[in-house]
Amino acid sequence: MATTVTCTRFTDEYQLYEDIGKGAFSVVRRCVKLCTGHEYAAKIINTKKLSARDHQKLEREARICRLLKHSNIVRLHDSISEEGFHYLVFDLVTGGELFEDIVAREYYSEADASHCIQQILEAVLHCHQMGVVHRDLKPENLLLASKCKGAAVKLADFGLAIEVQGDQQAWFGFAGTPGYLSPEVLRKEAYGKPVDIWACGVILYILLVGYPPFWDEDQHKLYQQIKAGAYDFPSPEWDTVTPEAKNLINQMLTINPAKRITAHEALKHPWVCQRSTVASMMHRQETVECLKKFNARRKLKGAILTTMLATRNFSVGRQTTAPATMSTAASGTTMGLVEQAKSLLNKKADGVKPQTNSTKNSSAITSPKGSLPPAALEPQTTVIHNPVDGIKESSDSTNTTIEDEDAKARKQEIIKTTEQLIEAVNNGDFEAYAKICDPGLTSFEPEALGNLVEGMDFHRFYFENLLAKNSKPIHTTILNPHVHVIGEDAACIAYIRLTQYIDGQGRPRTSQSEETRVWHRRDGKWQNVHFHCSGAPVAPLQ
């Protein structure tokens, strides 16, 4: 009988101590390596709760962190899998967040902001040279190595980072934190390294005045501002900022990513590399005051989300079941925090300047209709009823990372592509249908009497002899569609399908089938490679 050997290397080599941070599926604890006595931070991921896709993301994060060795990046020292848990052993950084340190300083000037952004840009440049795009640059991920004066800035959290080849631009999914997202990501266009520079521009703007360039409580309006590049330098606070600093911000917040300054170029900007003569040395007390309010607002919103996670097992981009034993006291805490948030968020003076030239709110409505009825009698109208794959959004939270928007977008893509396939069937358009299907499409369907059918000829028969000639009204309702994303280029959709139609005697009929379609993406296009349909044959086999 074979014996399963369970790895216990982390347990054997490290001693765990107090918690120093928490996430939706992980906790960070201080640890000590027993043989050396050196302190580290262990990110402990509960792998029992992870999906296959989450496992892929974890492997990607570890792979990326192993690549990066720079004085301004939190370094990964070890990556260990044990039964039920994965341990990522990082530098222990004890200086806290950069933004929290700034507000505690007695003196803070433009030159200090220049030194901060220089270190951030050095970290970003190293990432880009190693073919890594961080995708989630924001204040929460900018830490200080220690409490000592002049401690190095450290870039942390590569959970959303991706690997790219050179200056490759592609659609890597909708991911990041709302206030720091670039226009190209919001437009769902191909993107790459320039997204990190855009986020650096937002961070630099905040470093100089203590509030962000783009702001609106309505996330849609916020996104409209970002896509339009609608920011300005209002008086009086910007009057004391040097033109060179504003110039660098403008080059970072350039809408066209091809024209946006690179990390290498930004480090050569006079305001960065010649700060002693170019950047102002004047103390910026108003910036410090605004930054205190900005920090307080970030922390409160973080507390609200953490409480929601605790009380509802809820995270951005995921929908899970709340524990049955949740206390009403915890629920009350959530409501109390929400009320505090409303009070704080309604005060424009609290670290957020109102926009003077924000764009008009224009609504773009996408219909998440999915539709997959039986092969013989496809509907003219399709409806999704009770779509269980609808993913909950968080409450207004511009500092909350959107972790699974890419998966959500892919699910909607699958539904939309399936709808296009059904549209082709509805129209009796075999040519359009064939473009969406793999030439070697396989299927199990009632019409094939339990046999596996391969290729398009079997389906062509129904197009030419039934579908193209059908003129009677048909209505389909799709019940409880589930989309399973399988890696980057595969997905499966399953659903119950009700089809209403008029039979040959003019009587209304309803048929039900349970169906599954498997999709594979090739050359950027989804193709149906297999489907399985249960039930009785819809078309009369005579």
From Swiss-Prot:
Post-translational modification: Autophosphorylation of Thr-287 following activation by Ca(2+)/calmodulin. Phosphorylation of Thr-287 locks the kinase into an activated state.
Active-site residues, record numbering mapped to chain: D136 (proton acceptor)
GO terms, biological process: activation of meiosis involved in egg activation; apoptotic signaling pathway; calcium ion transport; cell differentiation; G1/S transition of mitotic cell cycle; long-term synaptic potentiation; nervous system development; neuromuscular process controlling balance
Record-level GO cellular component terms: centrosome; cytosol; postsynaptic density; sarcoplasmic reticulum membrane; spindle midzone
Disruption-associated phenotype: Impaired long-term potentiation (LTP) and hippocampus-dependent learning.
Function: Calcium/calmodulin-dependent protein kinase that functions autonomously after Ca(2+)/calmodulin-binding and autophosphorylation, and is involved in dendritic spine and synapse formation, neuronal plasticity and regulation of sarcoplasmic reticulum Ca(2+) transport in skeletal muscle. In neurons, plays an essential structural role in the reorganization of the actin cytoskeleton during plasticity by binding and bundling actin filaments in a kinase-independent manner.
Domain writeup: The CAMK2 protein kinases contain a unique C-terminal subunit association domain responsible for oligomerization.
Protein name, entry field: Calcium/calmodulin-dependent protein kinase type II subunit beta
Gene behind the chain: Camk2b
